């Protein structure tokens, strides 16, 4: 086989593995240490036998349903590459919508305290820090292993005003007397009894980042009940949460039952599913 980039791309695409275009190019970027633009401009470039061998190893693991992000130990999120491993949830494309919803608020303010609860890899909070490095960003998680990954990403992007804090959900803010101006969070939201979950998610991703009690509503209920304890209500504040596509009605009922006094709205994702809750006072 002529091992040009062009032929290798076709080889990967023709394997019986479900990969999107971005995944295919991410594999090549990882193996030859070149970016997308270089790759598509050098399709006649020949790969070495060692590089071909590494690609074959990756394809073998993918055939066993091993997640690509864990194989490469990296995942694109909001146009940046983040380090990930099996200790953190793999960042999803739909989670980028959280950054879309907060970007204007982050860019237009230089003295915010931004808190990323249940941070995992840190991709949400770090993406905010990269939008405006004048704000202070705190990444929190109950898992020390997750924070080790998040801290590695902080160092990767040379962020001075971003730090990690270990603790349980909002308790870590209350304990440290922290009141945020912006809270972003993609908490565990899968019902413990939910049987309709992809097998590779169950088999490989950390359960602590997936499942929550009370039909997956546990973290939303706690946050909604305690907003005044964790945000600075004397200034403009913004909270953006991600939730499961079938949870909108249940979360809306939580808001109503708790007589939330702040503005709130729901937003859909790329596939027209309800995905985000936005709470704010402006």
From Swiss-Prot:
Descriptive protein name: Release factor glutamine methyltransferase
Positions of substrate binding: 186-189
Methyltransferase is among the record's keywords: yes
A GO biological process held by the record: methylation
HAMAP family membership: RF_methyltr_PrmC
EC number(s) stated in the UniProt entry for this protein: 2.1.1.297
Function: Methylates the class 1 translation termination release factors RF1/PrfA and RF2/PrfB on the glutamine residue of the universally conserved GGQ motif.
Entries under CDD domains matching the protein: AdoMet_MTases (cd02440)
Keywords: Methyltransferase, S-adenosyl-L-methionine, Transferase
Entry keyword annotation includes Transferase: yes
Catalytic activity: L-glutaminyl-[peptide chain release factor] + S-adenosyl-L-methionine = N(5)-methyl-L-glutaminyl-[peptide chain release factor] + S-adenosyl-L-homocysteine + H(+)
Pfam families, per database record: MTS, PrmC_N
Family per similarity comment: Belongs to the protein N5-glutamine methyltransferase family. PrmC subfamily.
InterPro entries: DNA_methylase_N6_adenine_CS, HemK-like, N5-glutamine_MTase, PrmC_N, RF_methyltr_PrmC, SAM-dependent_MTases_sf, Small_mtfrase_dom
Single GO molecular function: protein-(glutamine-N5) methyltransferase activity
Source domain of life: Bacteria
Residues involved in S-adenosyl-L-methionine binding: 141, 169, 186
